[in-house]
Amino acid sequence: MNKEKLEIIHSWVSANVEEPCEISPASNDASFRSYWRLSFDNDTKILMHAPPKLEPLESFLDINIRLESIGINVPKILKTDKSKGFILMSDLGDKKYLDVLNDDTVYCLYTDAIDTICKMQKEASTENLKTFDIKEQRSELGIFRKWFLNEHLKINDETINKTKFNQGLEVLQNKIDSIPKSFVHRDFHSRNLMMTQKNNPGVLDHQDAVVGPITYDIVSLLKDCYITWDEKLTLDMLHSFSNKIKDVYNFSSEEFVEWYDITGLQRHLKAIGIFSRLNHRDNKTSYLSDIPRTFAYVEKVLEKYPYLTNIKSACHELEIKNLL
């Protein structure tokens, strides 16, 4: 953390927080936002700083209100300073799902998380939310092409265009666009869920919420880029989720698994692109270690559905696995 950044944080706290407190980093984030824990004698609070020109606060505040109004455990907003990019909020603790998940806790923790997804889908307002449409999918998959294929693997566009990669993505995008849509958190995974004593889980990083595929948040949870589970366990949890929402949507079990798989494929390609961008643009090298795990999810799905053959063949022709 550079000295100038620290001075900005300390200056804001001095001017806006009356009680004396200790300031320490609360978490690392895959964005321009930073989080700080303010420790008081008998309490802690979280201070989020998001440079206004890079990470406007309006979306975070908007989605926070939507989720809080239906009983989702999101931080309580205590003070905002939009002009300088600060939000002071309640502290949901330091027990990320990623740190406490194991074979003994996974069913309980994921059941709570699944109930939260169901509640968001059924009750959260989607008024004026952006739709996760083909244009948005295409933009995200462009991150994979630019930052992973071009920048990280040094594969130029001419080489990519000799394959049927683009044609394969068009098929994928159209398939995903036909999936029923609902409120989507969009980053519902083990680093953004906090284990809490009451109303578990605490839900963070919700500012990018959209109206999107009903399988988006569940695949973010069960095919997590940061932790892998046995396929039987994830399918059991998936069926538990589908049983809880089947009264709202019309689908067969096979169809739902397919929606889950292809939504995950799009998300995982995007995530690989973002991990590469974090390394090359933002000097956050630790995310590179998550690429092999994420690409393994991609490979499994490409083997399952014949209409994904063009993407599968392109990955083989570009020798992606050998270059990881």
Go through each PLM region and give its residues.
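Conserved NTP-binding catalytic cores of kinases and kinase-like/nucleotidyltransferase enzymes
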Residues: 1-86, 196-201, 315-324
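An alpha-helical support segment within catalytic cores of ATP-dependent transferases
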Residues: 5, 9, 13-15, 125-130, ...
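Active-site acidic catalytic loop and adjacent metal/ATP-binding pocket
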Residues: 25, 34-39, 47, 120, ...
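ATP-binding pocket architecture of kinase catalytic cores
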Residues: 36-139, 143, 153, 177-178
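Secondary-structure capping and boundary motifs in well-ordered enzyme cores
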Residues: 109, 185, 210-211, 260-265
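Active-site activation/catalytic loop segments of kinase-like enzymes and analogous catalytic loops
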Residues: 143-152, 214-250, 262-282, 294-301
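Histidine/acidic-rich helix-loop-helix segments that form or flank divalent-metal centers
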Residues: 250-258
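ATP/Mg2+ or Mg2+-diphosphate-binding catalytic cores
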Residues: 273-324
